[in-house]
A protein has these predicted regions:
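Polytopic transmembrane helical bundles with strong interfacial aromatic enrichment
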Residues: 1-132
Length: 132
């Protein structure tokens, strides 16, 4: 719908966001209007990115190195997914980039589950196991 970033065409919000072609109910625009759907997808992406950064900063405070590493991987996956989403938009969503973006979402979900598991069930470490 809008192969531009960060703006959507000329503005932040698409001008015809609530237009439904057959004059149907306005609520259908949330599912049928490509501009509004893309806007909502972008806003969800920004929200996930901001929340992910907060979670990463909190996860970095763990005393367990493997938990920290899991949150680092989460932040890296989040960054790659955002960049991939922006590139997909700028290239007008070719199939290979769209599929890569969807695969990135699955990978990001997996990294979230892994980081959460590491935070809830950290691998205990001992000073005796450390090599000098």
């Amino acid at each position: 719908a809008f192969p531009t970033w960060p703006l959507m065409g000329e503005g932040f919000f698409p001008a015809d966001a609530f237009y439904v072609p057959d004059g149907g109910a306005t609520w259908r625009a949330f599912f049928e209007n490509p501009g509004l759907v893309q806007f909502l997808h972008r806003m969800l992406g920004y929200l996930v990115f901001a929340f992910g950064l907060v979670v990463w900063l909190k996860g970095r405070k763990s005393a367990h190195p493997r938990t920290k590493l899991a949150f680092d991987w989460l932040a890296a996956g989040l960054f790659v997914q955002v960049v991939l989403g922006i590139v997909t938009v700028l290239q007008s969503a070719p199939l290979h980039l769209g599929l890569a973006h969807q695969f990135g979402a699955i990978l990001l979900f997996t990294l979230i589950v892994r980081a959460r598991h590491r935070a809830l069930y950290p691998i205990s470490t001992s000073l005796r196991d450390q090599k000098a």
